């Protein structure tokens, strides 16, 4: 998909995933090195069907990234869950996030999903505003018990 000079495509080979490391670090700081990140992505791809989709500028630079899975629950039916969504610092508020959400929405419909879900940390107020502008609604709280 291409829109507003942004090309959106699945990142599937090892080099694509390796290229995503520095951008994903802006969101997920728990991996201290590229190798542990690559291993985690591969494990998630194998175990949960995790996918990465990238938004690339006209020069091929990775400007945005989303990680997602398909899932199904009695309460929701089949849905697409966005686990990671990050836009490169310096490129935020330029429509790239909207292009990714649009791609994810279309992709979810094409795969028979009835909804798109994501969690967002309480302190990410700018992200909350963005998601609301994109049509997502606050519908639940997410509770956690660290073990």
Regions found by a protein language model. Give the residues of each.
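Acetyl-CoA-dependent GNAT
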Residues: 2-6, 10-77, 102, 146
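Conserved GNAT-family N-acetyltransferase fold
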Residues: 53, 64-66, 80, 85, ...
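Conserved GNAT acetyl-CoA-binding A-motif
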Residues: 108-119
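Residue-level recognition of the GNAT/N-acetyltransferase active site
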Residues: 88, 121
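Conserved acetyl-CoA-binding loop-helix of GNAT-fold acetyltransferases
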Residues: 87, 93-106, 133
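A conserved beta-turn-beta hairpin within the catalytic core of GNAT-like acetyltransferases
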Residues: 72-82, 92, 138-139
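Conserved active-site alpha-helix within GNAT-family acetyltransferase domains
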Residues: 98, 122-141, 145
């Amino acid at each position: 998909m291409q829109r507003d000079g942004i090309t959106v495509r699945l990142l599937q080979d090892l080099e694509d995933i390796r290229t995503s490391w520095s951008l994903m670090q802006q969101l997920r700081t728990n991996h201290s090195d590229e190798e542990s990140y690559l291993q985690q992505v591969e494990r998630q791809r194998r175990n949960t069907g995790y996918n990465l989709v990238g938004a690339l500028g006209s020069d091929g630079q990775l400007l945005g990234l989303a990680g997602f899975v398909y899932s199904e629950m009695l309460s929701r039916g089949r849905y697409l869950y966005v686990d990671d969504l990050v836009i490169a610092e310096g490129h935020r508020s330029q429509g790239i996030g909207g292009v990714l959400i649009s791609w994810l929405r279309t992709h979810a419909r094409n795969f028979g999903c009835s909804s798109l879900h994501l969690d967002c940390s309480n302190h990410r107020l700018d992200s909350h505003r963005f998601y609301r502008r994109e049509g997502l609604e606050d519908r639940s709280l997410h509770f956690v018990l660290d073990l």
